[in-house]
Amino acid sequence: MPLSTSLLGKKSTYKDSYDVTLLFKIPRINNRNELGINSNNLPFYGVDVWNTYELSCLNKNGKPWVGVGTFYIPTDSENIVESKSFKLYLNSFNNFVVESVKELERIILQDLSNVTHAKVTGRIFSINTKVEFGVPSGKNIDDLDIVCNNYGAPDNSLIEYEDVLVEEEINSNLLKSNCLVTGQPDWGTIVIKYKGKKLKYDSFLKYLISFRNCNEFAEQCAERIFTDIKNAISPDFLSIYIVYARRGGIDICPYRSTDKSYTLPSDKRFIRQ
């Protein structure tokens, strides 16, 4: 189905009962073709981490339960889920009776797996769970004194490097793009770990800032950045992790890595989540 038929950017009515048909799928292949990514031979591994903060149902006595959820959609899934449709879908459980939280978890994981055509994993837990905030790992490059004048479209020609090999981790809180459909801002913290030619911090920060008025989904921004770095420095190893600020009760955190046996940099939320 074309994106124009989705609920994103439109006035919507919340359903009174559980409705799996609310989930709207978007094929990954469309955006990947634009980036020159072969969907049959992906240059990366990873997941999209979805943290959801509006989750409720009724127990068998009609008493409400509230919680939060974390779900992991593999990068090799055929589809992603449009975020507003996921929000409406989750809220369709508000008056739905389930035997247990585990049953709710099973239903959601099965529905997401069916829509994305991949095995989605995750968990649901109580809002009374203690949560600690983390900070981005690596060297922060945001305090560099640079002049920026490119906000029209991501400009990979800004990526420069030094002719020296390094293994390092850097981060920035200055990534911003806009939702492809609504134009609402997506604020992101990006953590990059790589082994290869040393990125010049000043030019790379300008590159990240050039996304400021870019209209793309979070997942496509992540894959564009990964592809641009890979093409620029041909690293022996590369991973990127973008932690986006919460919007509409959901935050999306794409992770991409050249390492098949990857581990996520941190399971702690950052301050903007």
From Swiss-Prot:
Name of the top EC class for this enzyme: oxidoreductase
Pathway stated in the Swiss-Prot or TrEMBL entry: tRNA modification; tRNA-queuosine biosynthesis
Chief location bin: cytoplasm
Active site positions: 179, 186
Single Gene Ontology MF annotation: preQ1 synthase activity
Record field: catalytic activity: 7-aminomethyl-7-carbaguanine + 2 NADP(+) = 7-cyano-7-deazaguanine + 2 NADPH + 3 H(+)
An individual GO BP term: tRNA modification
SUPFAM superfamilies (alphabetical): Tetrahydrobiopterin biosynthesis enzymes-like
Keyword check for Repeat: no
GO cellular component: cytoplasm
Enzyme Commission identifier(s): 1.7.1.13
Cited InterPro entries: GTP-CH-I_C/QueF, NADPH_dep_7-cyano-7-deazaG_red, QueF, QueF_N, QueF_type2
Residues involved in substrate binding: 81-83, 218-219
Cellular compartment(s): Cytoplasm
Source organism, top-level taxon: Bacteria
Pfam families recorded: QueF (PF14489), QueF_N (PF14819)
Keywords, comma-separated and alphabetical: Cytoplasm, NADP, Oxidoreductase, Queuosine biosynthesis
Binding site for NADPH: 83-84, 247-248
Function, as annotated: Catalyzes the NADPH-dependent reduction of 7-cyano-7-deazaguanine (preQ0) to 7-aminomethyl-7-deazaguanine (preQ1).
Family: Belongs to the GTP cyclohydrolase I family. QueF type 2 subfamily.
Subunit details: Homodimer.
Protein name, per record: NADPH-dependent 7-cyano-7-deazaguanine reductase
Organism the protein comes from: Rickettsia africae (strain ESF-5)
Gene name of the record: queF
